[in-house]
Regions:
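Core segments of cupin and vicinal oxygen chelate
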Residues: 3, 10-52
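Vicinal oxygen chelate
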Residues: 5-14, 61-151
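Short, flexible helix/strand-to-coil boundary loops that buttress conserved ligand/catalytic motifs
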Residues: 23, 82-85, 128
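A short beta-turn/loop motif at secondary-structure boundaries
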Residues: 34, 60-61, 106-108
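Short polar/acidic secondary-structure junctions
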Residues: 46-47, 59-61
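Conserved beta-strand in the GNAT
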Residues: 52-57, 125-128
């Protein structure tokens, strides 16, 4: 259906306990742990509303394939991501050939992003939608460069 919303997404891990600790460190609330199935479910966003979930499934190492998903945040929240992750010992990842000293902007959306990885190598992203009109011709650039185009 065209107007359907994403309720849950899933990633794989080779060590469920390590993954649970990592996602808890990001502030996600553990909703349910099924030890016998080796899966953990976390609420995303407002856990009171129970509108989004992340499932983390333990698999054998030879079955593991890294994946990607993004957490949607506000621009103000995005600006605090480097300090938040650094305090937890999590490194930001360079992306699209650009260093991680500031967010990168996907000008076609437009959205500003920081990328990082979980302990298994799944690619994660904090993403903030920007209020300006898209400028796809700009490609991917740092936020400071994006902001200069509006001065």
């Amino acid at each position: 259906m065209k107007n359907a919303e994403l309720y849950e997404t899933h990633v794989k891990t080779v060590n469920l306990e390590s993954a649970v600790a990592f996602y808890k460190s990001l502030g996600l609330e553990l909703a349910y742990l099924l030890e016998e199935r080796r899966v953990a479910f976390f609420y995303l966003g407002d856990s009171e509303k129970k509108q989004q979930m992340l499932g983390v499934w333990e698999v054998k190492e030879h079955e593991f394939v890294p994946s990607h998903f993004a957490f949607k945040v506000t621009v103000e929240q995005l600006r605090s991501v480097p300090q938040l992750l650094e305090a937890k010992g999590i490194a930001l990842s360079p992306s699209f050939g650009l260093h991680a000293s500031e967010p990168v902007v996907h000008a076609w959306m437009p959205a500003a992003c920081y990328y990082f990885s979980d302990p298994d190598g799944n690619s994660l992203e904090y993403l903030a939608l920007l209020d300006q009109e898209p400028k796809p011709e700009l490609g991917v650039l740092h936020l400071s460069e994006w902001e200069k185009t509006f001065q």
